[in-house]
Amino acid sequence: MEMEASYNWFLVGLSFLISVFGSFTGLQITNGMKSSPQGVSLLWVFAAALSLGGGAIWTMHFIGMLAYQVPMDVGYSPGLTFLSLLIAIVAVGIGIYIAVSGRLSIVRLLGAGLFTGLAVASMHYIGMAAMVMPGVMVYDNTLVGVSIVIAVVAATVALWLAVNLKGNLLMLGSAVVMAIAVCGMHYTGMAAMGMEHDHSAHYVAIENSMSPMTMGLFIFCASMLLLVICLIMSLHQLNSRMDEELGEPDHI
């Protein structure tokens, strides 16, 4: 029999906030790379991938998982959890590199969006498979398909915005839209999942030393700190470049 599940709405709110800030930071970094006379830097590609893939997508996903409450003990496989994080960062990094390393044609955009979106969807379902509990997951294939479509569309739009946006206000608005899309994909994927008790299965508990609320707050704060560092570094680079450009006439 399928179990009733509920959500901790405070953690749901945190998952949305981190997705907005991660999206904004990633857009800032990518926009700075696109306008840089030095061209694409792999270090900044990594920083953007860390912000978007690690912050806006994976951290949102994991806090959203912690917000999901079922009447049984739930642990997380460290190996699969780390794999899902790695997939998110690497896939988004590849997508960003494709987007900023040359003229973003329709073919390049759609190809990068498809690859990144499918990888993000894979990250989500691998992350869900990392849940360790005395139960089995059952899926609604229609909702799974919808979540994958949302992931591909969201990734494609995100890559286009990352390359074409100018101005902090537009970036903030776009970051909110991106966060809505990322959360939409995640919670559609969660809605596709049902949970049933499996009394016959061999279950090895993975103890969590922290409650879901404590763990969610810890991950939120750690991710925010990392994103703030990335954003400050990006803004510092942008200000230094502007100072250099303003100083150029003095040398003519």
Regions found by a protein language model. Give the residues of each.
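Peripheral, non-catalytic segments of secretory and membrane proteins
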Residues: 1-252
